[in-house]
């Protein structure tokens, strides 16, 4: 049986993201970890929620130089963004959230 909820899960997550910056930061970190673990569907879904709750697709489009339509497509359930596109998106979201970029260390 497929249940329909009164409020879609993404909407609940977006509300929490808007009201809790720490949650947004942790969600972003979790999304990046999910990318490394190969759980692309989860990662793209959470990144999409973070964008909707914060920076927005229009501002993200301006920040990364990719049309809003292509960003929607890249972060959709069927999205398959290139590494270059994903890097631009992750960098812009991290900047928006105030997450410092790690510096590579070569030993």
Model regions: which residues?
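N-terminal flexible/basic segments that precede or flank functional cores
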Residues: 1-44
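Alpha-helix N-cap/helix-initiation sites
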Residues: 21, 25, 40, 57, ...
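Residue-level detection of the helix-turn-helix DNA-binding "recognition helix"
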Residues: 76-77, 94
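DNA major-groove recognition helix of helix-turn-helix/homeodomain DNA-binding modules
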Residues: 83-100
